[in-house]
C-alpha cells in the first residue's frame, strides 16, 4: 500500500492512468450473477425498506460474519483462492477496488453469490468500484460517487439493506472507498457528509465498512465525527495487522446495535490490504425497538 503514496511521482502516474479510465455520466449498479444492469437509486431519495413487501431470506441475528477487503483490482496472485475461501465463512463481504473482469465475474457465478456493485469508473472497458457480497439478497441498495479532486477519478459508495431473520429490523451495510489524494480535507468531508445524509434516517442496526484512506490524523478525526453522530462503535484489536499508511490504519469497520463476538485481521499477499473479519450478533435491545415509519421516496421533489 505504501507504494501508492510516493507523492508527486504517484500523482503524475495516476494522471496518466486516467487516459485508460472512462467515467460515466450516471452510476451503474450491477447486481447478482444474472448481470442485470440498471441505474441505482439515489441515496438521497431512497425508499426505506420497511415499506417494501420483499420476503427475502434474512441474515442470522445470532451470527452475522462480515469481511471487509480492498481487493486491489485483482492485481496480485492468489486473490481468487482467498476470496473464495473467505466467502465460505462470511455472510457479508464489503469489497473495495472490485474489478469486474471475467475472473471475478466467473467466481461470483460459480459460487452463486448474491452481490451488488456500484461502479466508480471503467478501466479498459471493465467496471471497477465497490461491491457488497452476501448470502442473502439485498432488499434495496443505493449508491453515489465522489470525484478525486486531483486525479479526477471517482470513488464509489454503496448502501445496502438486508432482512434479519425473525425481526422487522433491517441491517444497513454501507461500503465506502474514501477519497485519497487531497491537499486538505474538504473533499473528504464532503464525501463523509454525503454518506451521513444517505444513512442518518436509519434507526436500526448498521455497519459502515471500507477503505477510508485515513492516512492522517485529520482524516481520522473526520471519520470519528461521523461515527459519533451515528452513535456507532469501532473495533479494537489486540493484535492489529490492519493495513497502515504513515502509521495510520486505513481500513475500518464501525457498527451499531450489534455485539462483536469475534474479530481478526488476516495477513495476505493477494492484495495490498489485509482483510478485516468480524462476527456480530444482534443486540437484544435492537430487537425491541419499534420500526419507525418512513414515507415513500418522492418521484420528483427529492
Model feature map: region roles:
Residues 30-53, 92, 96-170, 266-267:
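Structured beta-strand-rich core segments of catalytic domains in phosphoester-bond hydrolases
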